[in-house]
A protein has these predicted regions:
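Short acidic, Gly/Pro-enriched loop/turn segments at secondary-structure junctions
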Residues: 376-383
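Short clusters of hydrophobic/aromatic residues that line enzyme substrate/ligand-binding pockets
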Residues: 361, 388, 404, 430-431, ...
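Metal-ion-coordinating, acidic/His-rich active-site neighborhoods
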Residues: 384-401
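An often Trp-containing, charged/polar helix-loop segment at the C-terminal end
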Residues: 453, 457-504
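Detector for glycine-centered tight turns/loop "hinges" at secondary-structure junctions
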Residues: 380, 434-436, 492, 501
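Substrate-binding/charge-relay-adjacent region of secreted/lumenal peptidase catalytic domains
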Residues: 2-7, 11-110, 118, 123-372, ...
């Protein structure tokens, strides 16, 4: 008997200092202004991303999952299958977390799909570990009226040992702590309908405009579908329940998941997202993933965690940020995370933004970007619809145009947005701390589209069909699916005009829920 030789021992970890890609902003004229070094005792929290394993294999799987001619069509991967095939290994995660701990940093969480590590410490500990000096930058928001706020920034690349650099994708985010605001209860007794109801749209009017009411009438209201809503902070429970009650939406309360602990503040945006997603799909199981605040670290982790846990089949994110003001690592991480969603059969929808530019996470080709229109609704139907001048639109700075977008107007080598569009320029009603407000934005359009998808998935399930999952490949390649969209040919942004067929301000146009149900294979 020949005894095989033992394999040689692995080489020792290479400690050579190696530059790595930071997802932390640098000074940028008109966006980020340097305010000097951050004090060493300041607290930070951040995210490190690890790379997808076998990217070529994942891309091949995605092509087959969304090819009607493939025997693998819509045979989505489970969370366990995608981790086994494509998630970073537990061993690699341990190498990185052990190194962080050795640098006196605290590791608080590892994402369910192992794509992210959440860690914290002081600025001094970070500077020593990564051989940099963190700075304060003042960030100017692109929307008028929003006040600048402080963020961390860098003037140089981080440096880590080579054995760490080989195992990470990027430092994706680094954030200052959000000031804790007291979450006061609101007195919502005797809340009735808005006094001047004609100044905003109701859930019934929007459902009529986009064909959702037709599916409601057929008995499909989202039953059995888990609809995910990503929010920053928390929403006001009584506002949400009263909104639904006033507008005749009979539904159960949302279930709230807090991936990083309890909320630090209440955010108006979160109220409207939950109210409208739940109203359009009244029988869907609403699952709200509540980040502690709306900073990148909290939102990116919670976005990915909703995907990693794999319990929803459609999700919406209205917390959009201009792509040109986000570091490259942020843009790419949203793409990698949403690739996992596509493989799992999760439809990811995101507001395309309200500043006529390109936003993240909508710039990811694995996300369906929801742009904006202005719609007129009368007698239970849309009577006119044009492109909204602030509809987030354009081509990505970095992310490549997928094959199914090449050759479209304005598309050269980069991904174009949006993919679809719904009302964003005419007011929607929402309830905030017991008071009625009518407001605009793609922040409404994305949860409405998510509710629409949930209702369509409910109808598909009744026919034995799986959820639609990643919408984009079939939306861009199926003429019968495109034909169900209301083509928007008038209006536009300062840069792009609506035209026949796909265009930058509105994508393929406005969806019709019944048409999508009838045509999507």
């Amino acid at each position: 008997m020949i005894i095989p030789e033992a394999p040689p021992p692995p080489p020792p970890p290479d400690p050579t200092p190696t530059p790595s890609n930071p997802g932390v902003p640098a000074p940028l004229p008109g966006v980020y202004t340097d305010k000097g070094e951050a004090p060493r005792d300041e607290h930070f929290r951040g995210l490190i991303a690890l790379p997808i394993r076998d990217m070529d294999g994942l891309e091949s799987t995605l092509r087959s999952l969304y090819d009607p001619a493939s025997p693998r069509f819509r045979k989505y991967l489970s969370t366990d299958e995608i981790k086994e095939r494509h998630a970073p290994t537990e061993a690699d995660v341990k190498v990185v977390t052990d190194w962080l701990v050795s640098q006196k940093l605290k590791v608080d969480a590892v994402a369910a799909n192992r794509l992210l590590i959440y860690f914290e410490g002081t600025v001094g500990q970070f500077n020593d570990a990564f051989h940099v000096k963190l700075r304060y930058l003042s960030r100017k928001p692109p929307q008028e009226g929003n006040q600048p706020h402080l963020v961390f920034g860098l003037l140089e690349a981080i440096t880590v040992p080579k054995f760490v650099e080989e195992r990470i994708q990027a430092l994706v985010s680094l954030d200052i702590d959000e000031p804790v605001e007291p979450i006061q209860p609101a007195d919502n007794r005797d809340v009735g309908p808005p006094k001047e109801i004609e100044k905003g749209y109701t859930p019934k009017q929007i459902s009529d405009a986009y064909g959702v009411s037709k599916l409601h009438a057929m008995g499909f209201k989202g039953k059995g579908v888990k609809l995910g809503v990503l929010i920053g902070g928390t929403y006001h429970h009584h506002d949400v329940m009263d909104f639904w009650q006033v507008f005749g939406v009979a539904r159960k309360d949302a279930r709230v998941v807090e991936p990083l602990g309890p909320p630090l503040l209440r955010i108006r945006e979160s109220n409207l997202d939950v109210q409208w997603a739940g109203a359009i799909a009244p029988e869907a199981d609403l699952v709200v993933y509540a980040a502690p605040d709306a900073r990148n670290t909290s939102m990116i982790y919670s976005f990915n965690e909703m995907i990693g846990r794999g319990e929803v089949t459609v999700m919406t994110d209205s917390f959009a940020h201009r792509e040109d003001s986000e570091p490259r690592a942020v843009r790419y991480f949203y793409m990698y995370s949403s690739m996992f969603a596509a493989a799992q059969g999760i439809t990811v929808l995101a507001a395309s933004g309200d500043s006529a530019g390109v936003d993240v996470p909508a710039s990811s080709p694995y996300v369906t970007a929801v742009g904006g229109t202005l719609v007129g609704v009368k007698d239970g139907r849309a009577v006119w619809e044009i492109a909204w001048e602030e509809s987030g639109s354009g081509t990505s700075l970095n992310l490549a145009a997928p094959e199914w977008q090449k050759g479209l107007p304005g598309i050269d080598s980069k991904r174009g947005t949006p993919d679809v569009a719904l009302n964003a320029g005419m007011g929607y009603w929402y309830l905030w701390l017991g008071g009625w407000y009518s407001n605009i934005g793609t922040s409404f359009a994305s949860p409405v589209m998510a509710g629409l998808v949930a209702v369509v998935n409910n109808a598909r399930e009744s026919q034995g069909k799986p959820p639609m999952g990643w919408l984009n490949p079939l939306l861009y390649t199926r003429k019968d699916v495109q034909a169900t969209f209301r083509d928007i040919t008038e209006g536009g942004t300062p840069k792009y005009k609506a035209q026949k067929g796909w265009d930058m301000p509105t994508g393929w146009g406005a969806p019709d829920a019944e048409g999508l149900y009838r045509t999507m294979p």
